[in-house]
UniProtKB/Swiss-Prot annotation:
Record's function text: Binds to the 23S rRNA.
Subunit structure: Part of the 50S ribosomal subunit.
Originating gene: rplO
Name of the protein in question: Large ribosomal subunit protein uL15
Gene3D superfamilies: 3.100.10.10
Pfam family, one: Ribosomal_L27A
Keyword Nucleotide-binding: no
Length: 158
């Protein structure tokens, strides 16, 4: 057997239909385009979404703005200025702040923000610190212990 002797299997191919070659051919006269109108003329026709001059649906419908985050991270926040009321060399955690009454509701892990001035040396234990908060706590003679556990966090490679 040679390459020029290879043919498709019998019944596997179908002849293409010749459009517009007479009424008896089956697809003659208007060639499957119906009667008159823009869709039967030559050319590409209308663009997708065109409604004949009527205001199209995608312009009639109000657009959704400000999509919410899928997995927003919520933090219980406190500014360093509020920590001045604590006694010196105290260990500050989310639980201790709730006991003292500086924080009333637990909205998630503690995040320390840098608004205000700090004069008392404190040991602050929290998962998140802003850079200014960290600088103010350390300049007051205190220390920051980062509790964020990155060992169990999912990586992008998995």
């Amino acid at each position: 057997m040679r390459i020029h002797e290879v043919n498709p299997q019998k019944g596997s191919t179908k002849r293409r239909r010749r459009i517009g070659r007479g009424i008896s051919a089956g697809q003659g006269a208007s060639g499957g385009f119906g009667m008159r109108g823009q869709k039967s003329r030559s050319g590409t026709g209308t663009k997708a979404g065109f409604e004949g001059g009527q205001m199209p649906l995608y312009r009639r419908v109000p657009k959704l703005k400000h999509f919410p985050l899928v997995n927003p991270s919520h933090y219980t926040i406190i500014n360093v200025g509020k920590l001045n009321s604590l006694s010196p060399n105290t260990e500050v955690t989310l639980e201790s702040l709730m006991e003292v009454g500086l924080i009333t509701s637990n909205d998630g892990p503690l995040k320390v923000l840098g608004n205000g001035e700090l004069t008392v040396p404190l040991t602050v234990r929290a998962p998140k610190f802003t850079a200014s908060a960290k600088a103010k706590i350390e300049s007051a003679g205190g220390s920051c212990q980062d509790l964020s556990d990155t060992s169990n966090a999912p990586s992008n490679n998995e």
